[in-house]
Amino acid sequence: MSGSFDRKLSSILTDISSSLSCHAGSKDSPTLPESTVTDLGYYSAPQHDYYSGQPYGQTVNPYTYHHQFNLNGLAGTGAYSPKSEYTYGGSYRQYGAYREQPLPAQDPVSVKEEPEAEVRMVNGKPKKVRKPRTIYSSYQLAALQRRFQKAQYLALPERAELAAQLGLTQTQVKIWFQNRRSKFKKLYKNGEVPLEHSPNNSDSMACNSPPSPALWDTSSHSTPAPARNPLPPPLPYSASPNYLDDPTNSWYHTQNLSGPHLQQQPPQPATLHHASPGPPPNPGAVY
């Protein structure tokens, strides 16, 4: 054992001394030595003997080099580890499994947290929850009552205006009028309609109610038909027409005032004939 170690040590010392002598000779001459081939074989032989016991792969093995750095603490994080990709894949798979697990658990929870607010289960049957009733003030009730006496049916603009005046919604006004009409019809059938809501005082009910026969009878007797009026008595026959006897006749009055001009302004027989129902005028009666 010690003999082999001594031989290796002596060979190493011989190599060192020969290399020193070779470098000293090369410094003296500016050119390379002539025996280049022999020197190459001389250097290659001891190198082969020295590195024969150690394979080439062990000196350049990256894993061995990596573990040496791990011992010194320079690469403690393991960034250059060949198994880093597997650890990353495992962590990613764990993250994927973690993300997929709560998803099916959230679906039934979301369904349970959002039930319908207006439907309640009573004895296994769905029952709709009624909304709270609207409480009207005395001022609102008085205004609605006065408007109901005028008209039992409101148009859309009228309903919107009334709701804005009373501070109510249009739905509340519509529901109040519907309830009031149903109550009024029930009282009307039972004969308990108050005087203020009688058909004579309400325009809308007057149109819907049947006509009163007493009103039609009194109107027919009080206002007789014009066809039943007696004819006026016939006028007595006179020789002179009516327009001559009437002193207010403007044409006759002007003719009497201007006597000498009677022949210059003869009367129009067509208009005079239509004006009087009697016989045609006689021009000789004027004189």
UniProtKB/Swiss-Prot annotation:
SUPFAM superfamilies: Homeodomain-like (SSF46689). Its main location: nucleus. Keywords: Activator, Cytoplasm, Developmental protein, DNA-binding, Homeobox, Nucleus, Transcription, Transcription regulation. Coiled coil: none annotated. Residues 131-181 are annotated as: Interaction with DNA. It is found in: Nucleus; Cytoplasm. Residues 198-209, 247-265 have a biased composition (Polar residues). Residues 129-188 bind DNA. It comes from the Eukaryota. PROSITE patterns: HOMEOBOX_1, HOMEOBOX_2. GO terms for molecular function: chromatin binding; DNA binding; DNA-binding transcription activator activity, RNA polymerase II-specific; RNA polymerase II cis-regulatory region sequence-specific DNA binding; transcription cis-regulatory region binding. Residues 195-287 are annotated as: Disordered. GO terms for biological process: blood vessel development; BMP signaling pathway; gene expression; hair cell differentiation; hair cycle; hair follicle cell proliferation; hair follicle development; hair follicle morphogenesis. SMART domains: HOX. Residues 227-236, 277-287 have a biased composition (Pro residues). GO terms for cellular component: cytoplasm; nucleus. InterPro entries: Distal-less_Homeobox_TF, Distal-less_N, HD, HD_metazoa, Homeobox_CS, Homeodomain-like_sf, HTH_motif. Heterodimer with MEIS1. Interacts with IPO7; the interaction facilitates nuclear translocation of DLX3 in dental papilla cells. Belongs to the distal-less homeobox family. Transcriptional activator. Activates transcription of GNRHR, via binding to the downstream activin regulatory element (DARE) in the gene promoter. This is Homeobox protein DLX-3. It comes from Mus musculus. The lineage of its organism: Eukaryota, Metazoa, Chordata, Craniata, Vertebrata. The gene is Dlx3.
